Design a protein with these regions (language model features):
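N-terminal hydrophobic or amphipathic helices and topogenic motifs
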Residues: 2-11, 15, 20-86
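Short low-complexity, flexible loop/linker segments enriched in glycine and/or proline
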Residues: 61, 122-124, 173
Length: 175
């Protein structure tokens, strides 16, 4: 019995040490982002493009929307100037690579917060600023009133690499 307790204690101690080092490394990486942003003098902010109300550039290159406002708030808080932002338009496919590679400092665009993104990619979500839902649009004259009326071979479109795609696959796989 004593031998088992000793082995368990060793395993727990090993995990505690590994956790301490990994937490220290994550904290160091996060502080480097802030440190590098301050040295650079501007925040590199990843946004979507052409999504009025969220992030959209006009013909003159002036950005507007709630996601843009978040970027400006971060610049004001960290650099003392809300105009110290460089916006980088990113697709759903590009957004996480740009963030994890350090191409951008923060990501402020339509992105669903999921457990797998939190755990697997290692992202830190700061909070939800918009709640949405999902549904299907069909032509008015199609006669389709619900998804139960979809026939085999019905075409459905969505953006690849999004939570919407995964939810749609789950929905149809369950039928």
């Amino acid at each position: 019995m004593f031998k088992i307790i000793k082995q368990l204690t060793s395993v727990v101690a090993m995990f505690a040490v590994l956790f301490a080092f990994s937490t220290e490394t994550m904290a160091a990486k996060k502080s480097k982002t802030l440190e590098n942003t301050k040295k650079r003098g501007f925040v590199r902010c990843g946004v979507s493009q052409g999504l009025p109300g969220f992030s959209n550039a006009d013909e003159s290159g002036n950005w507007t929307g709630i996601d843009v406002d978040v970027c400006r708030a971060v610049a004001a808080a960290t650099l003392g100037d809300a105009t110290k932002v460089k916006f980088t338009p990113l697709s759903a496919k590009e957004r996480f690579t740009a963030l994890t590679s350090g191409e951008i400092d923060i990501l402020s665009r339509n992105t669903t917060w999921t457990l797998s993104r939190d755990a697997d990619i290692g992202l830190t979500f700061v909070g939800v600023n918009f709640y949405d839902g999902q549904g299907f649009m069909v032509r008015k004259g199609s006669g389709i009133g619900s998804t139960s009326e979809f026939k085999n071979g019905t075409s459905v479109c969505t953006n690849l690499g999004t939570t919407t795609e995964l939810n749609m696959r789950d929905f149809f796989d369950s039928k």
